[in-house]
Amino acid sequence: HDHEGAPAMPLPKRPEFYDFDLFKREPDRKGRDVPLKELRCVVFDTETTGLQPSAGDEIISIGAVRVTNGKIVRGETFERLINPGMKIPKPSIRFHGITDKDVKGKPDAATVLPQFRRFCGTAALVAHNAAFDMKFLELKEKVSGVNFTNPVLDILLLSAFLHDHADDHSLAATAERLGIEISGRHSALGDAMTEARIFLAMLGPLADRGVVTLGDALDVSRKQVKLRKMQARF
């Protein structure tokens, strides 16, 4: 929530997460062959109490939009605040502006995630730095009783494939390269909307590079994970 008089300290970026297994979720042959411009997908974002899902951080907000046949489906959005059952750490409030008061009396993840699961149905899931968001969903499988086995595309990895000359694949940098204006930054729904516009703006350049179907996109994503894991070792 940037407002005048706010300190001009840039927010630190979320660390990049890579999860090889995420891109092993192979849709069937028919699913692989679906052209990206006809793909039914749900583009989503989470806000969280911190950056360490395995160390007890929790989801406090989910926002999602539906994309069908290369268009954002207006009026088909999902937006929920979630009570994390813990105090929201001050440093994370700088990111998302969500306070303990905002989540007081809101449902917990065990209630919200089944609703989100129904919203997603069998659509492909699209997110920026998707392994981060997916890790939170995965760690809640036991309490929520739902798991997300949908194919997943990561905007960060697709950006790394398209703009391999660039170092910065943050949401802001990717949007700027594609000429997309960002609004509603750091609200889950605002970010999901931006991510949907970025994803759609990528379809032309991806097709120019031979990435036309869901299967093609999953293949280049896997290659990017491999590449980035190798680079991280040096």
Tell me the role of every PLM-derived stretch.
Residues L158, T174, T194, I198-A201:
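Generic recognition of well-ordered alpha-helical segments
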Residues D21-E138, K142-N150, D164-D168, A172, ...:
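Conserved non-catalytic scaffold segment of RNase H-like nuclease domains
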Residues D2-D33, A196, L200-F234:
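Acidic two-metal-ion nuclease catalytic site recognized across multiple nuclease folds
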Residues D191:
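Conserved catalytic/binding loops enriched for acidic/polar residues
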Residues N147-S159:
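Conserved beta-strand -> loop -> alpha-helix junction used to position metal-binding or nucleic-acid-contacting
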